[in-house]
Amino acid sequence: MDNYGETVARHKLILAAEAAQVHAQWFAEHGHLYHESMVELILRGREVSVGELAEALNGRQQLRRELTTLMDENGLDLWICPSAPGAAPRGLESTGDPIMNLPWTHSGMPTVNLPAGLDGAGLPMGLQAVGRWYEDEALLEWSAQLEVTLAQGG
């Protein structure tokens, strides 16, 4: 896998550029109604050149190829990793840290998050299963089996 910092930067660039494209008309007409963080994202996205976006999209495809090659070379059907670096946050102010999901989301690989118990404070913990690109149905089959195993404490 390439440098994680590069993956994060690429992901943010693509996210901003696509947000600017998708919201172009509505933002022009109703920009004053947008949340400040969305305004910042759209304005950043407007600054992304076609060349920068193309390079980021190519990097995303390269990451997907690298992950697929790793799976092929090691006979992996899926990856299993934590959903987040810790338990879910208390309250609704935050959805938590996306660090554990970002590489998979960026590469376009399907993910399923599974309940994996509670921490000492009673907050939920999770695992995510990551499947091969365009093999969502196989991931769902694996995830159903994993869910049963996790529920049994295994």
Regions found by a protein language model. Name each.
Residues 1-11:
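Gly/Ser-rich, acidic/histidine-flanked active-site/gating loops
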Residues 11, 55, 73-74, 83-102:
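Short, surface-exposed loop/helix-turn segments at secondary-structure junctions
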Residues 13-64, 68, 113-126:
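Short helix-loop capping/hinge segments that flank enzyme active sites or metal/cofactor-binding pockets
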Residues 48, 54, 106-154:
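Structural helix-boundary/capping segments
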Residues 66-73, 99, 145-153:
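Generic non-transmembrane alpha-helical segments
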Residues 66-69, 92-115:
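Small-aliphatic-rich amphipathic alpha-helix that forms the alpha element of a beta-alpha
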Residues 77:
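Conserved acidic residues
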